[in-house]
Amino acid sequence: MIENKKVCVILPAYNAARTLERTVAEIPMAVVDDIILVDDASSDCTSAIAARLGLHVVRHAANLGYGGNQKTCYRHALERGADIVVMLHPDYQYPPRLIGPMAAMLAAGPCQAVLGSRILGNGAVSGGMPLYKYIANRALTKLENLLLGARLSEYHTGYRAWTRELLAALPLERCSDDFVFDNQILALAIHRGYAIGEIACPTHYFPEASSINFARGVVYGLGVLRTAFAYRAHRMGLIRSRLFQP
C-alpha cells in the first residue's frame, strides 16, 4: 500500500513456468497488496506454480489472446479493490523493483498512467533488444507522437501502471484481444485527457523471455498504424471511430 492506496500487480501469463517464480521473488511486497495471475490456457504448469506461490490465480479455459488476458486481469483487479494496478510480464524481462516507484508516481497524483520506458536511459539495445525491433519502435513512436499529439519516448513497453479511475473509465472491451491492445489503451487514455508519465526501465532479452516473432510483429505494427490514423481522423471529424466514441 502506498499513501493508503491498494497496489495490485497483475501478471498476464502464457507458458510462464520457467520464469514465474524468479519474477515473483523480486516483487516488493512491502508496497504490493495483491498479485493476480491470469493464465491464458497455458500448456505448462504456470497455474500450479502461481498457486504454490500464493497468488490469486484465474485460468482461461481457452486462449483469449494477450489483450483478452489483460481485460481479465484489469477486471479482477478492480473487483478486488485495487486503487493502483501495475502490469508486469512474468517472463522476467522487466525489473520488478520499479513497481514501487511507478505506483508512487500515481499515488502522488500528477499522472494517471506510468510507463516503464526502455528507451529512456538508452537501455533497450544494451539489454538485448534486436536492432530491427529498436528501429521499428523508434519509427512507430515518432509517427504516433505526431498523430496522437503526445510526447512519449515509447508506446510499446509491456510495463505499465494505471489508476483505478482510468481503468474504470476506459471502454477496454472495445480494444483488441491481440497485442495491439497495448497501443489502443494508450490511445484511449490520450483521447480522454489522462496524464501519462514515464520512468526509465532496463530490460533483459534472453531465450526464456516472451517475444512476438517477426510476422506477428508486422501485424502488430500495422495495427498500431491503424489505431493512430483512426485517432487523428476521428479528432478531425473525418470518421467516427468506435474505439474513440464517448
Regions inferred by a protein language model and the residue ranges of each:
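Acceptor/aglycone-binding surface of glycosyltransferases and processive sugar-polymer synthases
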Residues: 58-79, 96-179, 206-215, 219-225
